[in-house]
């Protein structure tokens, strides 16, 4: 009997907060010698698994006696090992032919051919945590990646892609960012809080406890597929110069208003706060337009974002840790703030509108400041104490299969700093030229795509919303003022 690649290990509580699905994307590489590139990638994948064997593992229920119900673990492959790297040759197919985004009716099938696994794991088969598919085109390579999100977060995805690139460069690739020892140490830090949950925080909104997932997930899949037919997915770009100008304008408004200062300190918002708030504002503007009296807006609107906690603990998590080192930020703002209707029930919004009026700014700019400041203030509460409280809360959950993902109107994942475009695959391939994400299936799901290197930097946003809402978003004067809509094949430095 052969020795297993690695010892099975349990997932952390934070891993169990993530829905059981794959995060998938495509990277494209124009290359002159496709056959040489395929060989390079196959060798690189073998090198990667030799150094990081856990990436060949499978997700399964933990069968160790005495563990909590719902505990999941990563197991080494049993029996005949299935390749982590798949290769497909697409005769007479070109990179340009593959770049068109799929129609709503196709449900993303234009991209599915290049991805290694479906969005949902196949429950009647072993569930791999990582797969890559090498698609050999006539004029280049399309790499399709799939990461099981219950095991690997967005920062971890970027780290794995960069280390895969290093392995493809062979001896010249240098040391990996991922250390097997640091993976284990980081998991231990995320398993033990050192105390009870902090009573100042209520974690039920972010991590509600519900009934276990139904055994028949096929019905859930079919519901999502049907819902996806009503969705539209588009890529938008916001030039970084416009983001910086708008951010400085908002921060000036905050500096000009003593009433907005937090305990004597000057408040500020970041570029990410600004981009998220602009999207959130414009979506509610077009979902609940003033001229449509048939639509009654809700009293408030909510957003959820993942926050990287690797540097937020007193004993920081290793930057190369690939597991879920994230907690959820969930923030609600009264709908009147989005619809430019400040009232007595929102003194913060009223102060923003008063300051904007005094400085000669428009009403939507006051709303933007109000929303961005709410996000920034919530982010500032996610410190070491908060993170430890979340970990402790999850330690006390009697059945990990009951931990759910809190419901909000919008879910935003920022991949801005995961470093995918920094991956250098070597002389035959170099850096990725494009990253593409399959069409979304859920209304209100957004990705801020990774930062590119170039002389004309921009923020790229992958937006999935209802078809009618998308039409109104494209026509919204504020959104149109700052964005450029292009298919992913054209999202290049200009």
From Swiss-Prot:
Its EC number is 2.3.1.-. Pathway: Secondary metabolite biosynthesis. Belongs to the fumigaclavine B O-acetyltransferase family. This is O-acetyltransferase ptmV. It comes from the Eukaryota. One of its GO terms (molecular function) is acyltransferase activity. Monomer. Residues 181-203 are annotated as: Disordered. O-acetyltransferase; part of the gene cluster that mediates the biosynthesis of the indole diterpenes penitrems. The geranylgeranyl diphosphate (GGPP) synthase ptmG catalyzes the first step in penitrem biosynthesis via conversion of farnesyl pyrophosphate and isopentyl pyrophosphate into geranylgeranyl pyrophosphate (GGPP). Condensation of indole-3-glycerol phosphate with GGPP by the prenyl transferase ptmC then forms 3-geranylgeranylindole (3-GGI). The gene is ptmV. The keyword Transferase applies. Signal peptide: none annotated. Keywords: Acyltransferase, Transferase.
């Amino acid at each position: 009997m052969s020795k297993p690649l690695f010892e099975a290990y349990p997932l952390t509580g934070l891993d169990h907060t993530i829905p059981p699905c794959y995060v998938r994307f495509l990277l494209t590489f124009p290359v002159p010698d496709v056959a040489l590139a395929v060989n390079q990638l196959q060798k690189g994948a073998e090198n990667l698994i030799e150094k990081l064997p856990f990436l060949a593992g499978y997700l399964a229920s933990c069968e160790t006696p005495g563990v909590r119900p719902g505990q999941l673990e990563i197991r080494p492959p049993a029996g005949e090992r299935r390749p982590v790297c798949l290769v497909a040759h697409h005769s007479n197919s070109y990179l340009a032919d593959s770049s068109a985004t799929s129609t709503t009716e196709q449900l993303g099938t234009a991209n599915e051919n290049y991805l290694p696994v479906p969005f949902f794991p196949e429950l009647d088969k072993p569930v791999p945590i990582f797969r890559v598919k090498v698609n050999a085109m006539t004029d280049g390579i399309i790499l399709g990646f799939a990461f099981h999100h219950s095991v690997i977060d967005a920062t971890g995805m970027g780290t794995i892609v960069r280390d895969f690139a290093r392995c493809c460069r062979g001896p010249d690739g240098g040391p990996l960012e991922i250390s097997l020892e640091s993976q284990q140490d980081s998991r231990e830090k995320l398993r033990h809080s050192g105390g009870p949950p902090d009573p100042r925080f209520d974690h039920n909104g972010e991590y509600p406890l519900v009934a276990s997932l139904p055994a028949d997930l096929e019905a859930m899949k079919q519901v999502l597929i049907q819902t996806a037919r009503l969705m539209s997915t588009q890529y938008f770009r916001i030039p970084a110069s416009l983001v910086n100008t708008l951010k400085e304008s908002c921060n000036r408004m905050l500096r000009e208003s003593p009433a907005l200062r937090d305990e004597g300190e000057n408040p500020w918002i970041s570029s990410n706060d600004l981009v998220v708030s602009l999207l959130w504002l414009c979506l509610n503007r077009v979902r609940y337009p003033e001229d449509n009296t048939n639509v009654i807006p809700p009293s408030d609107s909510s957003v959820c974002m993942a926050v990287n906690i690797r540097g937020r603990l007193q004993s920081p998590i290793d930057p190369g840790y690939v597991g879920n080192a994230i907690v959820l930020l969930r923030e609600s703002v009264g709908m009147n703030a989005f619809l430019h209707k400040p009232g007595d029930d929102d003194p913060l919004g009223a102060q923003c509108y008063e300051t904007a009026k005094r400085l000669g700014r428009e009403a939507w700019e006051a709303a933007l400041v109000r929303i961005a400041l709410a996000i920034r203030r919530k982010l500032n509460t996610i410190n070491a104490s908060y993170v430890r409280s979340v970990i402790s809360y999850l330690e006390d959950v009697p059945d990990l299969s009951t931990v759910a993902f809190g419901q909000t109107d919008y879910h935003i994942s920022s991949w801005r700093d995961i470093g995918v475009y920094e991956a250098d695959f070597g002389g035959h391939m170099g850096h990725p030229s494009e990253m593409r994400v399959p069409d979304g299936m859920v209304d209100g799901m957004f990705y801020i795509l990774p930062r590119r290197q170039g002389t004309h930097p921009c923020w790229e946003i992958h937006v999935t919303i209802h078809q009618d809402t998308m039409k109104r978003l494209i026509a919204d004067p504020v959104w149109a003022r700052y964005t450029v809509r292009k298919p992913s094949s054209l999202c290049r430095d200009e």
